[in-house]
Amino acid sequence: MRFRYRAGRQITFPANPINTFRGALGYQLVRIACIQRKTGATGCSGCPVFEKCAYSQCYETGPGHIGQGEGMANEDVPHLMVIDGGFAGMQTLTEGSLFDFTVQLYGRAAESSPYIIVAARNAGMSGLTSQRVPCDLEEVIDDSTAKTVWSAHTDEIQLPRGNSLDLSEPGLLPHDSGEMKLRFVTPVAFKDKASGSITLEPEFSRIIGSLLRRYSAFEASDGRQLNWNFAALTRIARQVRIANLKLEPIYWERFSTRQQQRVPIAGVIGQATYIGPVNMFQNLIQAGEIIRCGRSTTFGQGKISVISTTRLSERESSDVFIDS
């Protein structure tokens, strides 16, 4: 859903406008969705409706939202919401300017659409950025159909029809060699499983691993379990090598209300060329253009696009793996 606002007066967004909108949206979503506000309890821990709450589904996604047990930490569960900004940060918009934010909801979080729309309207009325600039929500548009979901003129919600993303398991044989070029549109970063630290190295296996986790989690949140051979797919993905990198590191900070401190976030943008058994992963990678990959996707990171995919001839593919 694309949320179109009109600035009530001159407004200047910080480096990452998405973080500003996400914070304002979350604040208003708590106000309309949280039942614990009436009991004096703080946080989502122990809430009896945690798994059904619109706020927790989008902001505090946990194992229960994807049908998993308590062995998985919340930070390892892919968020069911991703936000995009339709403009760059660190710029001043004049009074009356139109600007957009896009919210994508995955799995069971799609049920939260009405709450998100009301919260987005309230966020604009309360004011955006630290200057609390009032911004009127003009309309909400379904990007997939270009139809109006809500407008200030009618003040009626016409819920968008959910789009399904049905993928078949990548075929394990044969392992045709190919070349794939990817663009990292917004900063991409990954969590290294061995060390637990954040890495900016866009290894192909890390991209595939992230996409497998995200897609399986979104499917599970809708009650569908994937019976794919994840171990075999991961082993094949590790055979893919980086042929060329043109990357630029991006560093920024966000203020964490929960931690009451600024939290650094990093990632890389640019292009990467991969060579090896990439063709079998083409559908999964293309799905990644929708579901994102890596860390901090809820803050707009992890947006990728496929530049090209080429099947290599036998001679070309054999030369790739010969040490010079």
Predicted regions and their residues:
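RNA-interacting cores
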Residues: 1-324
